[in-house]
Amino acid sequence: MFDFASYHRAATLADAINLLADNPQAKLLAGGTDVLIQLHHHNDRYRHIVDIHNLAELRGITLAEDGSLRIGSATTFTQLIEDPITQRHLPALCAAATSIAGPQIRNVATYGGNICNGATSADSATPTLIYDAKLEIHSPRGVRFVPINGFHTGPGKVSLEHDEILVAFHFPPQPKEHAGSAHFKYAMRDAMDISTIGCAAHCRLDNGNFSELRLAFGVAAPTPIRCQHAEQTAQNAPLNLQTLEAISESVLQDVAPRSSWRASKEFRLHLIQTMTKKVISEAVAAAGGKLQ
C-alpha cells in the first residue's frame, strides 16, 4: 500500500484547483507513471495527492474550423498516436509519443505529465516546441496562456505555480503545403529507454529554399530548447547539402550537453550534429523537398 497522508479525487477542474489551493503540499496525479514511483520510494513530498485523471475538462483532441488544435493535458500517449487529427496535423508529436516506453505505459502516461515533470529528456517536449504550442493554465486567479518555449526553467522545473493546473495544449494552424516535420530519438536501447538525445524539426520550403526551419533538442541543455542559431542559418538558404552542413555546425552554438553515465559530452555533441542532419532531411522529405 502507498503511504498517503491525504488523497482527494477531484470531481471537476474547479474542485481540483480548490484542493490544490487548500493544501500547499499536494501533488497532482494524472497518469501516475511518475508519481506512483515516488510513492513507491516513500518520497515524503508525494504523500498528499489530488487525483485528476478522470476529469473530462483535461481530455480530448479537437480541431477548430481555422485549423488550430486543442489537446487536453490528460490525453494519453496512446490516444495521441491513434487519433487521426494528430496523425495528420502533428506527425512529429505522434512519432515522439510512439518512442515513449512501451504500450502499457503509453496507455496511461499523459501528455501534460510528460511536459510538467520538467525533464530535459521528455520525448514530447521537442515536437511541442517545433509546433509552437501554447499552454492553457488554470488557477484560482483565472486562466493564462504561455508559450511552450520558455516554460521549462531548469532541470526538473517549469513555470507552474503550486495552485496551477495545465489544462490543454493549443497549436496554431499548421501549413498544409510544402511543409514537413520529423522526430528522432537516440537511446541505448531501441525501446523502453530514456533519450540520450532527442530532437524534432519542422520546415517550410519555397522554390528550392528553406523559408522557415524550427529545430528543437532535448538532453542537449538543462532544458528542452529551440536552436535559434541553427534556425537563422537555414532562413532563406538553398535546399542543399552545404546548407545542411552549415546548420549542423551552427547548432553547436545553441546546445550545452553534459557528460553522464548514459553518454559523454563529446559523444552527445557528435550525436547532435548527426541527428540535426537526419531529422532535417526527414522533415524536408515530408515537405516534398530534396536536399541536392
Curated annotation (Swiss-Prot):
It comes from the Bacteria. Residues 1-176 form the FAD-binding PCMH-type domain. The keyword Isomerase does not apply. GO terms for cellular component: cytoplasm; xanthine dehydrogenase complex. One of its GO terms (molecular function) is xanthine dehydrogenase activity. SUPFAM superfamilies: CO dehydrogenase flavoprotein C-terminal domain-like, FAD-binding/transporter-associated domain-like. Keywords: FAD, Flavoprotein, NAD, Oxidoreductase, Purine metabolism, Purine salvage. FAD binds at residues 27-34, 109-113, 165, 184. It is an enzyme of class 1 (oxidoreductase). Its cofactor is FAD. It catalyses: xanthine + NAD(+) + H2O = urate + NADH + H(+); hypoxanthine + NAD(+) + H2O = xanthine + NADH + H(+). The keyword DNA-binding does not apply. Presumed to be a dehydrogenase, but possibly an oxidase. Participates in limited purine salvage (requires aspartate) but does not support aerobic growth on purines as the sole carbon source (purine catabolism). Heterotrimer of XdhA, XdhB and XdhC. This is Putative xanthine dehydrogenase FAD-binding subunit XdhB. It comes from Escherichia coli (strain K12).
